[in-house]
Amino acid sequence: MALDEFTAPHFNSSALLVIDTQVDFLDDGASPIVGTSGRLPKITRLVETYRSAGRPIVHVIRLYDGDDVDLVRRAALRDGVSIVRPGSAGAQIAPSLMPDRDVELDSEALLAGRLQQVGRNEVVMWKPRWSAFHRTPLDDHLRDLGVDTVVVAGCNFPNCPRATIFDASERDYRIVLVQDATSEITPDRLTDVVKLGVCAMPTEVVVREIATAPAALQ
């Protein structure tokens, strides 16, 4: 589907959403998602580009605590499986993505629905379900910053990135999916979201667009 004046991304008013790129979902983690570790260098490149440009970054994470988790996860957690447990090493964001590797997640604040500031224009946000927009302050945060374009990358496309893309579309955001910085993408899955007006781009194209975009949001 060709992009037009309504769907073409505005990189000068964009935010990077990094979805669920946490230690437990990497190759040596408690619940590895195939391909996520392999995508990590590209995700890191995106984060460093947005950070250097002073543009907004939202690290979106899961924390499985108690019963407030997806139904499909509840049996495993009830039976003692520990995945992205609050306060655990596995719940931490992949170290290469953080501005300071000594920063630890404030699980209590995040589970209460608050954003955790980890850098200039850079926050961490917990989401209780697949979509980064469901029961979160994400939409308000982006609107307050003047963002109209979301750039999506991270872990396990068929679940959380895809749900986030659908909800972003319903809220009239322009959307970029960074296809080589998102795990578990297949040609069919990519075709499905492109039909929604999503712009699929490789990392280096996004990097170039950010480098040539007008001044960052203040």
Model-derived features: where do they sit?
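A short glycine-rich beta-strand->turn/loop micro-motif centered on a GG-aromatic cluster
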Residues: 150-158, 172-187
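Short amphipathic alpha-helices and their capping/turn segments at secondary-structure boundaries
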Residues: 2-15, 44-52
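Short Gly/Thr/Asp-enriched flexible loops that form oxyanion-binding sites at enzyme active sites
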Residues: 161-171
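A charged, well-structured terminal subsegment
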Residues: 199-218
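Active-site alpha/beta core segments
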Residues: 41-145
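Active-site-proximal loop->helix
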Residues: 184-199
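Short glycine-enriched, charge-decorated loop/helix-capping segments at active-site entrances
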Residues: 29-36, 82
